[in-house]
Each structure stands twice: as structure tokens, then as C-alpha cells.
Amino acid sequence: MKILLKKLHMENFKKTKDQTIDFGHITKISGQNAVGKSTVADAFMWCLFNKNSLGEAKFQVRPLDAFGNPIDHVEIKVAVTLDVDGREYELTKTQKQNWVKKRGAMEATLQGNDNLYEIDGAPKKEKDYKAFVAEIIDEDLFQLLTNPQAFVSKKWKEQREELMKMIPGVDNDTVIASNPDV
């Protein structure tokens, strides 16, 4: 399967108010520290897997004000356009705050965030969206291909399992038979 990242659009994602990146076969993203390079990778991973580029599920996606406080009442949106074997798909994740005004209360209170998902503009349930993404690429494999720390951060047994998946058909008996000193 051939997968190409064609476009990434971010709205109110971390420090990025509104940005679209059109990707070519080679796209260079560079800059000084703290200008948003990792934000691009985080947005991509958040849209596909609900994690940042380090594989962490809990991280701040909401933009912050000058004092480091989350900015409320803004919609966070990331749209990714992928070419999968010649067919384009647009995957979109939007996060909205759930504000509820209880009876008798003067102000609404934040009751959490709602994540909304779309594939090619059609709303999808989270499980259907995740299943669609999983058909394109396995999250663990994607982490191994894109994050140099993904493999070394695994426990040795998990590392061994990953290596054995990459070289199928080799079992312990074959290895032992090939080397009499083992």
C-alpha cells in the first residue's frame, strides 16, 4: 500500500491559528526552536490516532493565552488529506468544548470536550473513524516508521516481537540449527 500525505490543515491547534501545508514528494519543515515544527507532526498524529508525535494520549491541543491558560470557546480542527493507492481521502477531527448552563446557574460550566470525526466531509462515529484509519495503517507500525524513539522505548520482549514480525518464517529451532554454538 502506498500512502502519501498531500495536505494538512490546522485551525486553533496549539499555537497555530490557521495554517495549511501542501506536501510534495519532499517537504522541508524547518525553523528555530518553539516555532511549531513539532506541532505539525502532533496535529497529524492527533487527527489519525488521538496522540501526539511522541505517542502520548494526554497533551495540550488547545491554544494558550499570553499567561499560559487554555483559550476557551474556540473550535480546534485538523484535516489531513491522504493519497492511498491513488485515491484521496480527507480525514478531519474537530474538538469542541461542551458548555452546559444548569438551571438556576448564572454561567455555563465546561463539561469536557467533544471530538467530532469526518471522512471526506461525512460525519463518522469515533469507532468507525478509527477502523477506517486502521485499514490504512496500523498505529504501532506507523509509530515505528516515524518515531525513532518508538522502538527503543519498548520493553525488550516487545522489541523482540516487533523484530520477529519483520522477519517471518524464522523460529527458534531454525536459528539454533543454523549455529551449533548456540
Q: What is each PLM-predicted segment?
A:
Residues 1-47, 143:
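Pre-Walker A-like glycine/lysine-rich segment at the N-terminus of P-loop NTPase domains
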Residues 23-25, 94-97, 167:
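A short beta-strand motif that forms part of the nucleic acid-binding face
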Residues 30-35, 39, 116-126, 155:
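Conserved ABC ATPase signature
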Residues 40-43, 92, 128, 132, ...:
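Alpha-helical scaffold elements adjacent to nucleotide-binding pockets in ATP/GTP-utilizing enzyme cores
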Residues 47-57:
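Post-Walker A helix-loop "phosphate-sensing" segment adjacent to the P-loop in P-loop NTPases
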Residues 57-144:
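Nucleotide-state sensing region of NTPase/ATPase domains
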Residues 142-182:
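Extended, Lys/Glu-rich alpha-helical coiled-coil stalks
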